[in-house]
Amino acid sequence: MQNKIGLALFGALCYNLTQGLAFTLVRMQANALGDFRTLGLVVGLPNFALVAGSIFWGIIADRWQNRKAVVVLCAMCSSILYIPLPWLGPFGLILIRTLQSFFLGGMVQIATLFSELDPEARATLMGKLEAALGFGWGAGAFLGGFLVISEDYGSSHPTVVFSFLLTASLGVFAVVGYMGSTERYVPREVIKLNFAEYFWPISRLFFTTFIMFLGYMFFLSISPIYLTEVAGSSFGMGIIVLLSGIVHAITAPYIGKLVDNYPREKAIRASTITVFLSLIIYSSTTNIYFVTLAFLPPIYMTYFLGARAIIADNIPYQLRARAMGLLTSFSLLGSGVGSIVVGELLVNMSFQDVFRLGSVLTFIAILVGWYPFKSKI
């Protein structure tokens, strides 16, 4: 069993190396090809495809009763679509990235796989998963900043082409890792359940997710560009993101244990408060040390450890993949709307003004998600 978990973690690490690389490469390429409006569309529109993909693949995973097959299929298709990106203009980049994101929506099912390994330690095991995810994302973003200097973006420069091909290759390694893992099968009585009956008692979790990521994207969607400006180079930006990934990797197992030992809602409160405070810092100073400190906390990881554990605790297995997909959909819907809005706002506003607006939205998320979530089961 430990070997199978290790293979799944290897797949998750490689997959998130691709996500970290894409986080830097796609945003920097889009910004070089156009303006902030182009960047907003390249980041925002694919999020709506991710919404559709996460819902669609969640339903497919429930019907097939095979999460691994969905993850392998989606990882392979999304990896191939990295190959043409360096040769595309703004419209082509938006189009292919949107298509790719439909398949990326199925990757949420790796979290469902881990949530089934040990019901008594769901958050602990998902903490190990998040450690691989956090380090992979941080290391990938660093590679993007290290391999390509900011002046080379906006063209099919050899370093840009190599970086996207490397991203596709790492995606193939992720497929190999996922194929070697084994999904735990537990016989269950096949009964028809009404999803709405289980959704509404914890619906506030989904609305909190939407609002928080709507506000957080007021920074995160443009973070590679902003951090490059603050740090003075894409390499400096990569160092900041790598440090964040290392913090994620080190803290993930401990945060997972805390989520197992304390009410899940505390993770929601902690992450929403932290993202609010980080946006306040971004809007108040451009000091590289303060900006770096604000970027380090594992906000995304902490939020989803708590949220996924709440879903696993309160949604029956037959509906759980759909609920996980819906959670991701709400986060991506907020991210998509936030990214497009930010692209429009930055045409006439400064970074700091945009960050202040984001802090207002995240404060609302704190209020909406503060109280415990009611349970149906």
Q: What do these predicted ranges mean?
A:
Residues 69-83, 266-281, 359:
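Structural signature of the two symmetry-related core transmembrane helices
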Residues 53-65, 252-263, 346-347:
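Helix-to-loop junctions at the C-terminal end of transmembrane segments
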Residues 144, 166-186, 365-373:
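C-terminal membrane-cytosol helix-exit motif in multi-pass small-molecule transporters
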Residues 98-133, 307-310:
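Cytoplasmic helix-loop-helix junction between adjacent transmembrane helices
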Residues 265-305:
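C-terminal transmembrane helical hairpin of 12-TM major facilitator-type secondary transporters
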Residues 1-47, 201-240:
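Helix-loop boundary and gating motifs at the non-cytosolic
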